[in-house]
Amino acid sequence: MLSRRHFLRLLGSAAVLAAGRVRAQDWEVESPVVTRMREHLQWVIGGMGMALDFRAIDQAQNEMFRIQINADNLQPVASCFKAFILPYYFLNTPVDEWVYDDNSVLYSMVVHSNNAATGVVLDNVARRVPGDENAVVKFNNFLLQIGLSGGLHSWNWEGSPTSGLTDPRFAPSLVNGRVVRLRGQAYQVDNAFTAADLARGHDFITRGEFFTSSDEVREALRLSKELLSIPSTATGYQSPIERVFAPGYTGKDGILPASDIQTGRVVNDAGAITAGPDTYIIAFMSAGESESVALDVLREVIGQMDVYEAAIGGTRLEELIYDS
């Protein structure tokens, strides 16, 4: 459980947000409806190479439930982590130098998922962050500050100024256990995250603006969500979650073809869906399974969101589809 008090401590540790004292309440015992939801999703995922962190936030910014299935298992991350570069950029760049229009390198990074642009943003921000560490290490330090437990090992792409830079803390290794384990095999994948970490990052983006007294921080997180919410109609591309349920989606996906990685095809998507006053954070990771199977599982996750809304007398999915 991530209570509001715990969330505030987490944000305070980042030295970027300040908030007043609030009560820690949230949930202490999993409700029967959530237990049924969790058991259903465990049955759906079974022994497949998938991981899920699925949580709900109410309008008072309390966490209503959290369902985690293989959520602490490392999986290839593809491009999902790029969502977290947005607050990293905004919180380390003077407001009068923020550039995020559709011709900017930041836009290219997050909307078009340009890998070279990602390296340029990491390099540019690192030059503003104090210390002698390289750009990959500095970004990872930010991830740790906002509550994640992992980070990038490297970002080696042609045209990227981060090529050749590494963070030894997150090097793949059979010795320290930083490997992706699928179907009894261990794979040393260069960049691996957990679904739990992806959910933590989106929790920071989703709730952070409500707990800060800084207008600058609030605007940084608001803009991060705005860029992550650019509709597929603007790009002609839909993420896996959007292909299942597009209304109210804010997030970043990542796809790797089987020819590019030894684990087999990677299908990742992480973000938030707004349903009336409630927000659902979904972090889904799949490796070695077909895209059609991954989409089927995401349909089940979205279906359980509807189950929960029905149980609490909330907003049904057909209402969201109609409103969109």
Enumerate the language-model features and the residues they cover.
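Beta-lactamase-like hydrolase cores
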Residues: A24-N73, Q304, Y308
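Active-site-adjacent helix/loop patches that line small-molecule binding or acyl-intermediate pockets
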Residues: W27-R38, D101-A199, F204-G208
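Short, well-structured active-site flanking segments
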Residues: L91-S108, S113, S213, V217
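Extracytoplasmic
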Residues: G47-G49, C80, F193
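Structured C-terminal helix/loop/strand segments within mature extracytoplasmic catalytic/sensor domains
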Residues: D26-R38, D190, A199-G201, I205-S324
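Active-site SXXK
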Residues: L74-W98, M109, I282
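N-terminal secretory signal peptides and thylakoid transit peptides that target proteins
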Residues: M1-A14
